[in-house]
């Protein structure tokens, strides 16, 4: 649509942009792990951060680039630098001036849907979900075992070969749900809340 701007007039142009990855259902073509039509339709409603969380403290969080590992967070907690948890969604701390609002740590069910829509192939130290060119790339960032410090900035176990992505759902007792990825595997498991795992934020979940 062409708009004619007249001399002597004042105009305001408002630009709206959405950060993140969101695919239409018919673009979700990685179905080798049991991805269903329902999974595709539900995933199409979500927008994903393009990188893992990479911030310390408790305010103005950012996410990193798509291939960077980011930092490691205990279950449903902002960055603590140790094995403590604080019952705070770290995705809620993303800088709203830049990213907007509504970001959350994914639910167990959302990560389960995502885990089904992949070819389970580890490539370039990570795994593609939904689509291998325009989909979601999750680095195999490893994790931080709780006896090696929990939350922190560097992996202690499995970097480049495994990924451990936090959900926001408690599995009871000392464990919580997360998504595990390694070559040939993408699935939901439950493990220690005190471990440091990566976080990929989502909107619409």
Which ranges hold each PLM region?
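Extracytoplasmic cysteine-anchoring/structural motifs
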Residues: 1-38
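Generic structural signal for short, flexible, solvent-exposed coil/loop and linker residues
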Residues: 4-6, 42, 154-155, 190
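Extracytoplasmic/periplasm-facing segments of secreted or lipoprotein envelope proteins
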Residues: 41, 47
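C-terminal, surface-exposed recognition/capping segments
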Residues: 50-60, 65-75, 83-89, 93-104, ...
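Extended carbohydrate-recognition surfaces in non-catalytic/accessory domains of CAZymes
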Residues: 78
């Amino acid at each position: 649509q062409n708009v004619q701007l007249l001399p002597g007039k004042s105009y305001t142009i408002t630009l709206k942009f959405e950060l993140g990855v969101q695919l239409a259902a018919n673009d979700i073509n990685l179905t080798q792990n049991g991805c269903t039509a329902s999974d595709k339709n539900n995933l199409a409603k979500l927008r994903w951060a393009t990188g893992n969380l990479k911030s310390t403290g408790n305010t103005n969080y950012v996410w990193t680039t798509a291939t960077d590992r980011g930092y490691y967070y205990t279950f449903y907690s902002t960055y603590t630098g140790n094995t403590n948890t604080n019952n705070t969604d770290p995705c809620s701390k993303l800088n709203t001036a830049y990213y907007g609002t509504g970001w959350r740590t994914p639910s167990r069910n959302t990560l389960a849907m995502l885990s089904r829509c992949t070819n389970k192939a580890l490539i370039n130290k990570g795994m593609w979900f939904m689509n291998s060119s325009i989909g979601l790339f999750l680095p195999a960032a490893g994790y931080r075992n709780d006896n090696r410090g929990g939350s922190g900035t560097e992996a202690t176990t499995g970097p480049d070969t495994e990924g451990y992505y936090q959900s926001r759902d408690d599995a009871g007792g000392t464990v919580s749900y997360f998504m595990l990825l390694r070559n040939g595997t993408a699935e939901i498991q439950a493990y220690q809340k005190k471990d440091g795992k990566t976080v990929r934020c989502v909107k619409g979940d």
